[in-house]
UniProtKB/Swiss-Prot annotation:
This enzyme's EC code(s): 7.-.-.-
Membrane topology reported for the UniProt record: Multi-pass membrane protein
Family: Belongs to the NqrDE/RnfAE family.
Cellular component per GO, a single term: plasma membrane
Main location: membrane
InterPro entries found in the cross-reference section: Ion_transpt_RnfA/RsxA, NqrDE/RnfAE, NqrDE/RnfAE_oxidrdctase
Protein name: Ion-translocating oxidoreductase complex subunit A
Amino acid sequence: MTHYILLIIGTALINNFVLVKFLGLCPFMGVSKKIETAVGMGLATMFVLTVASLCAYLVDHYILIPLNATFLRTLVFILVIAVVVQFTEMAINKTSPTLYRLLGIFLPLITTNCAVLGVALLNVNLAHNLTESVVYGFGASLGFSLVLVLFAALRERLVAADIPATFRGSAIALITAGLMSLAFMGFTGLVK
């Protein structure tokens, strides 16, 4: 049990996919203008990443490896992720049409979110078993959601701040993301 807790902490805080591995930057910058949207995107990505990790493991170990078709991993994982995203999109549209409209184009873009594909491929490269794959996907999604919501809160505060004209918009957002990355570097060495 301790191994799984350390895997979640390590994936969410120490090896964060956005701030350390630079995966998932498109939704990180695009959806982080309002906290409500960031929370919705974080929850949707959390569900997709966890389920996609499970499905990718099952497809890889029960279809691709027995058929000696591991060279198709990237393509097959993209298809698996697309199916999971479509399922998530239909569920959100049915349960919360307002959130569905708020997320807009970013919900289908989870399919092309490199963090989701990165987690699936890293699970294979790190030779995780089924439980570790799901926990790794959950930890990665937890870290993604945490960073997304924190960054959205910072960006909402930046709107009211007196920022020089040359730094407004994307410039101050990137500087803030860099400072946030430095803050997360403080977690390095937390887990041995």
